[in-house]
Design a protein with these regions (language model features):
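N-terminal low-complexity or simple alpha-helical regulatory segments
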Residues: 1-134
Length: 134
């Protein structure tokens, strides 16, 4: 099972590079540079998580217990929301940029959360963001 996980990690890493170079070109997001930036941030966070999973599974490094891992984990849901929201919402209904800064809160509190609380809480926050988008 570990071999399959490592194979999928490699696939997702190469897919992230292909997406970053092909889909997230400036020409594709002329009127939405914020969505492009959040998409690239989302890819970077997911890439960081996958590298951490590789280090844990293959190299036996305890990076999944690190503060950086928790920050990455808590940055995925807000980055996905801030990438998707401008694409799904008409420009007149979009929140002000200052209000969008509130979405940084999960990543900012992540370093101070113990791992036993942080991991389930990150998934709860992600689920709440998905409900918000629907």
């Amino acid at each position: 099972m570990t071999s399959l996980a490592l194979l999928l990690i490699g696939f997702s890493l190469f897919s992230a590079v292909v997406l970053a170079l092909s889909h997230f070109r400036p020409a594709n997001y002329v009127s939405q540079p914020g969505a492009r930036a959040m998409g690239l941030l989302l890819l970077a966070a997911l890439t960081g998580l996958q590298i951490t999973h590789f280090a844990w599974l293959h190299l036996d490094l305890p990076w999944i217990d690190s503060m950086a891992y928790r920050i990455l984990l808590f940055s995925v849901a807000p980055a996905f929301f801030m990438f998707s929201e401008p694409l799904l919402t008409p420009a007149a209904d979009q929140p002000k940029p200052l209000l969008m800064c509130c979405h940084l809160a999960p990543a900012l509190i992540a370093p101070w959360l113990p791992a036993a609380i942080a991991l389930p809480l990150a998934f709860v926050i992600g689920a709440l963001y998905l409900l918000w988008l629907t």
